Amino acid sequence: LINIFFTAVKFIHIIIIRNYKGVNMAIKVLVYNEDSNDIEAYYLEESDTMPYATEGSITVGEFRGSSNSPTIWTTKGLMECWNTLREQWGSPIEVRYAFKRLWEGGHGAQSQHYAGTAMDMAQSFSPEDRDELRIIAELIGCFVYVEPAYLTPTWVHVDRRLNPPACAAGYIMVREGSINTYVLILQDALNTLGFTGAGLDGVFGVGTKDALMAYQESRGLTPDGIAGCETWTYLTSEVRGMGSTDTTVL
């Protein structure tokens, strides 16, 4: 195990390389650490445990699920909530769907799955066990949202979204200085549409602002460089499920 630390002005990248020779084949896992307001980067194999998760409780491959992306992201807070839920349940919990990138689609236009803050689980459980798991997820008070059974009767959806949303049930407003996984969604969408310069690091800097303003101006939106309700609505509707492009940062 090799740990390499890179320190920048406002954030820290932590790169963990388990197999240096195979790093190009590894999955890049970006984690937003709410405690330090940093983005951490890990290079892991699909069989490795997710960062901050209890050893062996959920692998990178399980969290990646049906996504084909070589880069995925989540938050420390979600993984800590998962640890508590798993501990309270006392036995393995199947997770079939967690992460997707916006251009891959598969969920609603402003789904928390694209932010890496949502998990769909317990698909193979009995209805009674799913009901019990929902109750536990509510009682631990860690998840921001636990979907009621009448909406997802054959699985349990939990998420740890950030609030308040710019639009009802949507994403938070992000602007220059923001650091979180919603910035990653924004950067990913802009890159995919050809508005490059933002990178894919979860840090809303000058490059992200310039790319966003160019997008807003091209779509007849107020070019204020802020991703609010109107911009999120246009951008997510346009990119969701369109597939990657030559300018997508994978």
Model-predicted regions and their roles:
Residues 1, 69-73, 178, 199:
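Short, surface-exposed alpha-helical recognition segments that flank or form part
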Residues 1-24:
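Short, Lys/Arg-enriched N-terminal segments with co-localized hydrophobic residues
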Residues 3, 8-9, 60, 197, ...:
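N-terminal compositionally biased, intrinsically disordered segments and leader/signal-like regions
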Residues 26-94:
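Active-site acidic/histidine clusters and adjacent loop/turn architecture
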Residues 28-34, 108-118, 123-194, 198, ...:
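Catalytic cores and adjacent binding grooves of peptidoglycan-active enzymes
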Residues 86-115, 134-135:
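Active-site-adjacent substructure of cysteine-protease-like catalytic cores
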Residues 216:
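DNA major-groove recognition helix of helix-turn-helix
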